């Protein structure tokens, strides 16, 4: 059987196109995961809100308070997601129930003990007219570099319990 030049031309022109269409047609939009609140890649947009539902104390000599499994804790179990609310001034003090605007949010990693342990964290920089000393909320956990994942909203909600809630900007 003899393949003509025209058949070869059609084959080499349309087969790559067909392969690209076949491969990409089943793939979801990669930007959709940034809009899915259940995705670990969810993008917290500026203008979102973090609502503190109860007053929390800042211990003496510290500039933060910690939350894990829906409770205020004195220290974090680093291998479970926990969050730290940072303030400008050393305690004793308190942060009163309020709504904070999230000015910027980012996710990142940093080495704790190379090559075995990394810190995976998400930080939200906060703003409040009534409490300008409240700086940020950082949610984090430690894991192996190949096993760890970005901190998801559902993990943050579990760590914060009913103490905080989120309202995400569209």
Model-derived features with residue positions:
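N-terminal secretory signal peptides
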Residues: 28-104
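Bacterial N-terminal signal peptides that target proteins for export
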Residues: 3-15
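Short, conserved beta-turn/loop elements at beta-strand boundaries and strand-helix junctions
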Residues: 103-113
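C-terminal motif of bacterial Sec signal peptides marking the signal peptidase cleavage site
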Residues: 23-26
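Envelope-exposed proteins and targeting segments
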Residues: 46-48, 96-98, 117-124, 133
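C-terminal partner/receptor-binding element of secreted or periplasmic proteins
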Residues: 130-170
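Hydrophobic helical h-region of N-terminal Sec-dependent signal peptides
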Residues: 16-21
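Short beta-strand and adjacent turn/loop elements
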Residues: 53, 123, 127-129
